[in-house]
Structures are given as C-alpha cells and as structure tokens.
Amino acid sequence: YEDIQYDSRFLEGAILVYLKKLGVVAPNKPDRTEMGSNREKFTGAYVQDPQRGKHDWVYDLDITSMYPSIIMSLNISPETKLGKVVGWNAEEFISKKNKTYSIIMNGKKQGQLTETELQDYFDKNHVSISSNGILYRTDKKGLIPTLLSSWFDKRKEFRKLAKKFGDEGDEEQYGYFNRRQHIQKIVLNSMYGVLGLPVFRFYDLDNAEATTKTGQSLIKFTRKLGNHFYNKELGTDKDYCIYIDTDSVFYSAVPLVKKRYPNVELSDVMMTQRINEIATEVQGFLNNSYNYFAK
C-alpha cells in the first residue's frame, strides 16, 4: 500500500541502493510526529499571466529538464549543504547594488562581506549559491546530483535509440525506447518534489526551495533575454513574452517577421519556415547567454 500511496518510495529506494554500493549508512526516516509537525510549504514554479488578446504564430521554448539540471549544476544534496547567505537576492547581486552580506554557517552568523568579497568566497571555496541563498560545496559531487546525472545520461541513451529505431521504421522498438525515455523524464523531474516531502528520508525544505526558486530566477532571466533579442532588432522597449509556465516561455514570431519581410504576404508554409528560423535563432541566443546567469 505504502509503495503505491507514497511514490517517493521508488526514489528513496534508488538512493538507498546507491548508498549501499558505497558502503554508506543512510539516516533514519523522520518519525510520524516529526512529519506531522513539519508540513511547511515551499515556493513552487513561476507562472506569468498571459498577455490578453489573440496571438498568431506563437512558439514556445523550454529549458530541458530544468529542475534536475539546477540540482546538478548547483550540486544540491543533503550532504553538500553548507550554510546560507542572509538577505540574498540574485538580481541585486548581478546588478551590483553595493550591498553587504553575512553568511550563516553551523548556526553562527559570520562577518559582513562586500559583493566582491562574497564572489571571491564563492570562487576560492568552490561554493555555489541558489536563489534562496543556500550555499553548496561543489568540490565533491553530491549524492542526488550523481544519481540524477546517471538517470539523465540514461534518458539521452533511450532517446537516441528511439530515434534510431524510428528512422529505421521499427515501430515496436521505437515505442519501447520512447516509453523508457519518458519514464526517465518523469523520474528525473520527481526528485525535486520529494525533497520537500516530509515523509521522504532526505527531506530538506531548503533544498526543495533552492531548486524551485532558482528555477523561477532562471525562467525570468530567460524572459529578459528573449525580450532583449526582440527589442534590439525592433528598436523597441516592450515585453514580447506572451506567457510563462514553469520552464517555458512563449513568443509570437509575427513582430520579427513583419520587420524582416515588410509589405510581403507570406503563405502558411513560408510562415512556418520563418517561425522555425526565428525560434532557432532565439534558442541559440538564450543558450549562449546562460553562462552569464550561472556566474
């Protein structure tokens, strides 16, 4: 009953098997009284209200496996968590607001650091920071990022095989590996959720919120990048992002098509080609800009 009622059991079991291979004993599960008193909520995904009206030739771009990628990039795991930066705001830090910050380590508040000193601290001590201010060591790969990396590679392998058999016309094998890659996707995306589940053995609200809040920051940054791409070409200062949902941004290709092909009536076939070209351009621009966000 519990294996079905609590889908976290599968993920917990995978972690326990991995720890056993390493010869590491996992911590005990929290007892039921702890579970009952620890049902705090954590920040979820960011959803932007859609721009009202009818929008033509809309395309969407999504961040591949956003939550698993965040966990792997920041090295979010129970044993890699170091402390917290008080009053952390990623956008303010990027904008150089000349704030000072203090760090809490082992329950003790340390002295004030300038932005430059804090950046030096991150670099010299191999530390990453999430959007809720939690610090993680990055000199040693964490348990959960290691598992996710393995599952991520397995999904890529299944997708590659699905494409291979699809191109060969083998529908049975294509269907099998396509289902397998989809299952891997579900498993990958489930991990962040159970981090904030009190019945999960490795429950940690900070780690759960580190994932979702960083996701919020990342998708908002994506919107800014997309708008910058549009505004730079069009010579405007507008918000062209029609809608945001978790890991996806939606734009219309119409403004750019009208700028590039003035006074030209394009057929649906030609418009489809143009929208694919524009989506590919914007996607490339976004991908090349994410390193700035990571730094």
Locate the predicted segments by residue.
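Short, hydrophobic/amphipathic alpha-helical packing segments
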Residues: 152, 215-223, 279-290
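Acidic, low-complexity intrinsically disordered tails
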Residues: 100-125
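Active-site palm subdomain of RNA-directed nucleic acid polymerases
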Residues: 219-246
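Common nucleic-acid-contacting/processivity interface regions adjacent to the catalytic cores
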Residues: 1-78, 84, 91, 170-224, ...
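Conserved core architecture of multi-subunit DNA-directed RNA polymerases
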Residues: 40, 65, 100, 158, ...
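Compact, glycine/acidic-enriched structural inserts
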Residues: 84-108
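C-terminal polymerase-core module
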Residues: 250-295
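Active-site cores of enzymes that catalyze phosphoryl transfer or operate on phosphate-rich substrates
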Residues: 119-200
